A protein has these predicted regions:
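A conserved beta-strand element that flanks and buttresses the S-adenosyl-L-methionine
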Residues: 117
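A short glycine-rich, Lys/Arg-flanked "PGG" loop and its adjoining helix->strand segment in the class I
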Residues: 129-144
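A C-terminal cap/extension of S-adenosyl-L-methionine-dependent methyltransferases
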Residues: 206-264
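Short alpha-helix
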Residues: 183-201, 207
Length: 264
């Protein structure tokens, strides 16, 4: 996906996708899951493809030192707008970096972070290995890598629920789909992504679902008062089988070996 594509997508992504109940639920569920694995603040966090900061700004509020990296000037401009509304002490804990995820090592000066996040970026990357390698090289030994990816095993659900039966039949063995933002996306499996991480000496610790019920029902008439209840249900589903296996996206958390912290 071309980097400049986000200049057209930044507004619908920030103003619609993240502002919706579904977007708020995604952010909250990922945050809860992250807090079970992150070291305590003021640990350093690199958010690769962090967009407008919806996932990393709450971490900065909690005391973490955050570097938000994104290749899109349009998305970083939205991050600057949102950051300007934060208290001074939160703004001081956030720095914005314009670069591709694949170039994160050079863009951050070779810094090693306590945690590296990459949520919702892999679906838009044709060649995932260079990005995964960069994520793993940016994390310190013993640090956490957190990745959210599109679930290749559930691609038939959405077209089936829309009664697009031909599309659903073809999706069982598909490796991607035409996404909700109008661009083609690529899907992963927990097992396949886990193997990519292990090749970089990063061992998977746990995996979760993220969207289950919220992806299947129309929440356009929902309001903010429902978010807390929806999050509670999605959190419970996210760690139980068979529910997590049916999630539209999955969240994989892994840890880098303590004795692996090679220079680049």
């Amino acid at each position: 996906m071309p980097d400049d594509a986000w200049s057209q997508l930044s507004s619908p992504f920030v103003d619609e996708a993240y502002a919706s109940v579904k977007g708020q639920v995604r952010t909250a569920v990922l945050h809860h899951q992250l807090m079970d694995h992150l070291p305590g603040p003021p640990a350093s966090v690199l958010d690769v493809g962090g967009g407008a900061g919806h996932q990393s700004f709450p971490l900065a509020r909690a005391g973490y030192e955050v570097a938000l990296l994104d290749p899109s000037p349009a998305m970083l401009a939205r991050a600057e707008e949102r950051l300007a509304r934060e208290p001074p002490e939160v703004r001081a804990r956030v720095r914005l970096v314009c670069a591709r995820g694949e170039d994160a090592v050079a863009a951050t000066g070779g810094e090693r972070f306590s945690a590296v996040l990459c949520h919702g970026v892999l679906p838009y990357v044709d060649r995932p290995t260079p990005l995964v390698t960069a994520l793993c090289r940016c994390v310190a030994g013993g640090g956490v890598v957190s990745v959210m990816a599109l679930n290749a095993k559930t691609l038939a659900v959405r077209p089936a629920l829309a009664r697009r039966w031909t599309d659903a039949l073809g999706a069982f063995d598909a490796t991607g789909e035409h996404g909700v933002l109008g661009v083609d996306t690529r899907a992963d499996t927990v097992e396949g992504l886990g193997e990519r991480l292990r090749a970089e000496h990063v061992e998977p610790l746990a995996w979760y679902g993220v969207w289950l019920f919220t992806d299947w029902i129309d929440l356009s008439d929902a309001d903010a008062s429902e978010v807390e209840e929806v999050v509670a249900v999605e959190l419970e589903a996210s760690r139980r089988d068979p529910y997590r296996q049916l999630s539209r996206v999955f969240h994989l958390v892994a840890r880098k070996q303590l004795d692996i912290d090679r220079p680049d």
